[in-house]
């Protein structure tokens, strides 16, 4: 959460409150637009274009109502060849939800694959359960209309979003496989250690006859 902003797609970055004030990082990544979503979201830096959404990290907080404005803000920035940073406080829940909704709209990914793709770039990404349910509902009811609206409004995309998202999704799957393998290996080592201790304990309490 504190290792700097992460690139999700060309021109789209995800980070935390600290990243949104890090002028060096912002300049390095050509950030000109900042989408800020947290309880006291407000513009902080001169020369930046802001979309500020006051919202709490509560499962009952309605974020779907902000998806269209957020998607348009991000997309218009990217079409200019500039960078957009989406952030909340920790860059874990609220901002991730908006970014996942955007990824769903510019690809044909469902919400789970879109979230996994985001996690491929930012491992701490973890929207609360209420936000995950909203993403699921968005995928069932609204995303198809949003894809049509985006195409009708901005034309055919020249980005390679699906390919970039697929690379992140594959990266996440590799990370999960490595973690699973490490956990299995650790479990075997622990079981071996317990067996060794048990054998020693038994030998200490037995005598030859």
Swiss-Prot record:
EC number assigned by the record: 3.1.3.16, 3.1.3.48
Ranges of residues in domain Tyrosine-protein phosphatase: 4-144
Active site: 88
Record key words, sorted: Cytoplasm, Hydrolase, Nucleus, Protein phosphatase
Composition bias type Polar residues, residue spans: 177-190
Localization terms from the record: Cytoplasm; Nucleus
Function in brief: Activates the Jnk signaling pathway. Dephosphorylates and deactivates p38 and stress-activated protein kinase/c-Jun N-terminal kinase (SAPK/JNK).
Designated name of the protein: Dual specificity protein phosphatase 22
Annotated organism of origin: Xenopus laevis (African clawed frog)
Lineage: Eukaryota, Metazoa, Chordata, Craniata, Vertebrata
Gene: dusp22
């Amino acid at each position: 959460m504190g290792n700097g902003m992460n690139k999700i797609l060309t021109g789209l970055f995800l980070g935390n409150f600290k990243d949104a004030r890090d002028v060096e990082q912002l300049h390095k990544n050509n950030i000109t637009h900042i989408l800020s979503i947290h309880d006291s979201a407000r513009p902080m830096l001169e020369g930046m274009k802001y979309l500020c959404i006051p919202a709490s990290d509560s499962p009952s907080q309605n974020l779907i109502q902000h998806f269209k404005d957020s998607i348009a803000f991000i997309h218009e920035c990217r079409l200019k060849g500039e960078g957009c940073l989406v952030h909340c406080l920790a860059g874990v829940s609220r901002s991730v939800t908006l970014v996942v909704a955007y990824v769903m709209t510019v690809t044909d990914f469902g919400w789970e694959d879109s979230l996994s793709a985001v996690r491929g770039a930012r491992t701490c990404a973890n929207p609360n359960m209420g936000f995950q349910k909203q993403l699921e509902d968005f995928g069932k009811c609204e995303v198809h209309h949003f894809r049509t609206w985006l195409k009708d409004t901005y034309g055919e995309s020249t980005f390679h979003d699906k390919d970039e998202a697929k690379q992140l999704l594959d990266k996440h799957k590799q990370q999960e496989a490595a973690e699973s393998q490490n956990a299995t290996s650790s479990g075997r080592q622990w079981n071996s250690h317990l067996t060794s201790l048990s054998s020693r304990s038994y030998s200490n309490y037995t005598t030859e006859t």
